[in-house]
Amino acid sequence: MAKLTKKMKAIKAGVDSTKAYEINEAIAVLKQFATAKFVESVDVAVNLGIDPRKSDQNVRGATVLPHGTGRTARVAVFTQGANAEAAKAAGADLVGMEDLAEQIKKGEMNFDVVIASPDAMRVVGQLGQVLGPRGLMPNPKVGTVTPNVAEAVKNAKSGQIRYRNDKNGIIHTTIGKADFAPEQLKDNLVALLAALNKAKPTTAKGIFIKKVSISTTMGAGVAVDQASL
């Protein structure tokens, strides 16, 4: 078992793993230990009251955070004609059809999000083995297959996050950077939880959001008292 560094020992000593912290206190604890030489991301893990083995209980979607994530996504769009011009005007970094598909087949994937208009899926469908494992395959459930590609580009550029539960029923995503103001992080977390509650499967019974923990890239998880949100 790897030895803990002095920093990790200090973090673990400073975080009470048995306690659910009031949100402002939780953020203060995170910021106290966010001492890396780069600006750390603030990540969240949300334990859901679902059975991930059942397809009708899986949770997947997207939402735009009010204060963004602290980084600007590079967006590739599969579309043509007037939609291509609209996508470029909205800020898309790459726009094309077969030509863009060829770039991707060659391994040129300098983008974070892929969006497609419905008529372009005949081209995108050929890229499933490349885009799928990377979580980049366009999907109507998260708004990345849409006739309104310009709006989708604007959402991606303005801090939209996509979420999907893992095999343990946990959502992992980012809600900002460690240098965000506490209120910005709180607003983003509240927006995410509201989106998750809206996406609750009708077949899920009992408590839906069971536990919320936030952490920085190099830090320990801090449980959040949901009553403080």
From Swiss-Prot:
GO MF assignments: rRNA binding; structural constituent of ribosome; tRNA binding
Domain of life the protein comes from: Bacteria
PROSITE patterns listed in its UniProt record: RIBOSOMAL_L1
InterPro entries membership: Ribosom_uL1_bac-type (IPR005878), Ribosomal_uL1 (IPR002143), Ribosomal_uL1-like (IPR023674), Ribosomal_uL1/biogenesis (IPR028364), Ribosomal_uL1_3-a/b-sand (IPR016095), Ribosomal_uL1_CS (IPR023673)
SUPFAM superfamilies on file: Ribosomal protein L1 (SSF56808)
GO cellular component terms, A-Z: cytosolic large ribosomal subunit
Alphabetic keyword roster: Repressor, Ribonucleoprotein, Ribosomal protein, RNA-binding, rRNA-binding, Translation regulation, tRNA-binding
Any single GO BP term: regulation of translation
Matching PANTHER family: 54S RIBOSOMAL PROTEIN L1, MITOCHONDRIAL, LARGE RIBOSOMAL SUBUNIT PROTEIN UL1M
Family annotation (HAMAP family): Ribosomal_uL1_B (MF_01318_B)
Role, per record: Binds directly to 23S rRNA. The L1 stalk is quite mobile in the ribosome, and is involved in E site tRNA release.
Quaternary structure annotation from Swiss-Prot or TrEMBL: Part of the 50S ribosomal subunit.
Recorded family membership: Belongs to the universal ribosomal protein uL1 family.
NCBIfam families the record matches: rplA_bact
Protein's recorded name: Large ribosomal subunit protein uL1
Upper taxonomic lineage: Bacteria, Pseudomonadati, Pseudomonadota, Gammaproteobacteria, Pasteurellales
